[in-house]
């Protein structure tokens, strides 16, 4: 299980998460939802160890293999096929050890590394990489083309293929369908439905999320809230929660108005003074409910005005 406890995360002076908690269980497939700038990508960076919490604790099982989809790719002379295979770093390490053993003509080490290669399915890795490329819309003629020859959108597809190639217990995908056509999106849905690890996806594609996820983490008002169900279910649950919060707020406001009216009318009367005092204590103990609202999609920051002459 992965857990965030009393987590606070800031970027500069902006508070993204404030004393929030989240538990993610093995094998859960989760959509991460929130307005732009709410902290979704920063949450991913924290899980990857690229950012540290300002307060609180992140707990993750030792040895958890994390894979993620990079958002940029530098021009490279490597072929598309080799780029995707590079996503499996364990394969590349064993491959390098095997080459070294063969150059040294060390029979025992050669046998050892062939055995390790067999354990990770390394002998069919080219076939698996070709399957990923084909599923994401690459033709066989493009497999050997250098990465530098592809446009930005196709390089993002290569990043996605490399992330899927990496053996992982935790897979983080940030807007994976942005540069995919319908056929590639449907293929990706099927691939992710077969994925056995824990999956977190940031996406604005509601249909895609509905077909892949079984949970939603909402990043809202500096908190992480877990909902059970796909995106459509999340929207219904959130609307119901907001309606309940609004009803509770209105009920509390009516009670506050009743207390204030009673105190105003009877505080000066000796026969009612004790009751008025009791109601004032009730008001002091009352935890005021904040108005229910959804985070705005917009964030405005105004500089401090200069002093007038």
Give each language-model segment a name.
Residues 1-251, 302-309:
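ABC ATP-binding cassette signature C-motif
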């Amino acid at each position: 299980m992965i857990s965030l406890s009393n987590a606070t995360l800031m970027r500069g002076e902006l508070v993204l998460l404030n004393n929030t908690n989240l538990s993610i269980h093995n094998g859960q497939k989760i959509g991460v939802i929130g307005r732009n700038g709410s902290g979704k990508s920063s949450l991913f960076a924290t899980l990857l160890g690229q950012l540290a919490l300002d307060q609180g604790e992140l707990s993750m099982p030792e040895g958890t293999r994390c894979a993620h989809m990079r958002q940029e790719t530098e021009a490279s002379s490597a072929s598309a096929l080799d780029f995707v295979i590079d996503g499996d770093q364990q394969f590349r390490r064993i491959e390098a050890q095997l080459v070294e053993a063969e150059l040294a003509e060390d029979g025992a080490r050669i046998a050892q590394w062939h055995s390790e290669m067999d354990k990770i399915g390394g002998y069919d890795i080219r076939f698996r990489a070709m399957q990923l490329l084909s599923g994401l819309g690459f033709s066989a003629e493009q497999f050997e083309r250098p990465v530098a020859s592809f446009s930005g959108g196709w390089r993002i597809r290569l990043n996605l293929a490399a992330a899927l190639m990496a053996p992982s217990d935790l897979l983080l995908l940030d807007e994976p369908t942005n540069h995919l056509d319908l056929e590639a999106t449907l293929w990706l849905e099927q691939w992710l439905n077969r994925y056995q690890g824990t999956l977190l996806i940031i996406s604005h594609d509601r249909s895609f999320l509905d077909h892949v996820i079984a949970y939603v983490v909402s990043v809202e008002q500096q908190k992480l809230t877990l909902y059970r169900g796909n995106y459509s279910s999340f929207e219904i649950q959130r609307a119901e929660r907001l309606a309940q919060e609004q009803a509770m707020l209105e009920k509390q406001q009516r009670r506050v108005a009743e207390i204030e009216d009673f105190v105003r009318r009877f505080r000066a009367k000796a026969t009612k003074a004790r009751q008025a005092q009791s109601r004032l204590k009730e008001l002091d103990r009352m935890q005021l409910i904040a108005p229910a609202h959804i985070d705005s999609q917009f964030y405005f920051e105004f500089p401090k005005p200069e002093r007038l002459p």
